[in-house]
A protein has these predicted regions:
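Conserved phosphotransfer cores of two-component systems
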Residues: 239
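Acidic/glycine-rich phosphate/pyrophosphate-binding loops and surrounding catalytic core
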Residues: 1-209, 213, 217, 230, ...
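Short secondary-structure boundary segments
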Residues: 222
Length: 247
């Protein structure tokens, strides 16, 4: 999965995070480096909580941008138990201290997403459900790619990365355009036949209207799952896929 991440994008994340944390000066790091006389030191990355390791490329990008090197002992996707030695980071003291917090913030958050994704996928599979657990666009602003990467490492799907790779008509879109059919006609005129269109539905009637109007995907939003899903699948027919959204 690491090959999915373009190197220029990783470098941009690293630069932004480092600039956010140390926009001008790192006085404490500078003082520590003076005491150390600029010599090379070694830091050890430890896993202190059980979970899925994820975010290695982002961690490494931050370290490299700060002038450090990383030697990994475990890879993204592995389940780690505490206390596990994950990696060794080498560099000057001030470089290690500069990279430490942004690199750890990214790694811990992405690993948390991956861990929850794996647990949710495991629970869904245990019920015999054949579908795929996916994450939505409800991501942290500016952190979507890392969080989507965490979902993939954890074994979940990403649903969509933004508004351009899948057209999704939510209730406000449908309301603004006067109805499900009108909304579908409107987006089809712009998207053509190359992009799939998903319609968010809050009732059985809306779901059937969306399927009849040509929606590729019908999303049931916060509906009672058991009987509603079965009934919708039976009535909807084979031409549209079904997704389920829940808080």
């Amino acid at each position: 999965l690491t090959t999915l991440l373009p190197r220029p994008r990783l470098q941009q994340f690293a630069r932004d995070w480092l600039a956010e944390d140390a926009p001008w000066l790192d006085i404490a790091g500078w003082a520590a480096s003076r005491r150390n006389q600029g010599g090379q030191e070694e830091a050890v990355l430890l896993c202190k909580s059980a979970g899925v390791l994820a975010g290695g490329p982002f961690f490494q990008a931050v370290c490299e941008e700060a002038g450090c090197t990383v030697q990994w002992e475990h890879r993204d996707g592995e389940w780690l138990e505490p206390v596990t030695r994950v990696a060794t980071v080498k560099g000057r003291v001030n470089d290690l201290l500069l990279a430490e917090r942004p690199a750890l913030n990214a790694l811990s958050r992405i690993s948390g997403v991956a861990t929850l994704a794996r647990e949710a996928s495991r629970k869904a599979k245990a019920t015999g459900w054949p579908g795929l657990v996916t994450g939505t666009r409800k991501t942290t602003p500016g952190f979507r790619l890392p969080e989507k990467y965490g979902l993939l490492v954890g074994g979940a799907g990403t649903h969509r990365y933004g508004t351009t790779d899948l057209v999704m008509l939510k209730d406000n879109h449908v309301w603004a355009m006067g109805g499900v059919k009108e909304a579908l006609d409107g987006v089809r005129a712009l998207a053509g036949k190359t992009l799939k269109v998903e319609v968010e539905c809050r009732s059985l009637e809306e779901a059937l209207d969306a399927a009849a109007a040509g929606a590729d995907i019908v999303m049931l939003d916060n509906l009672p799952p058991e009987n509603m899903v079965r009934k919708t699948v039976k009535l909807m027919g084979p031409d549209a896929s079904l997704t389920i959204s829940s808080n």
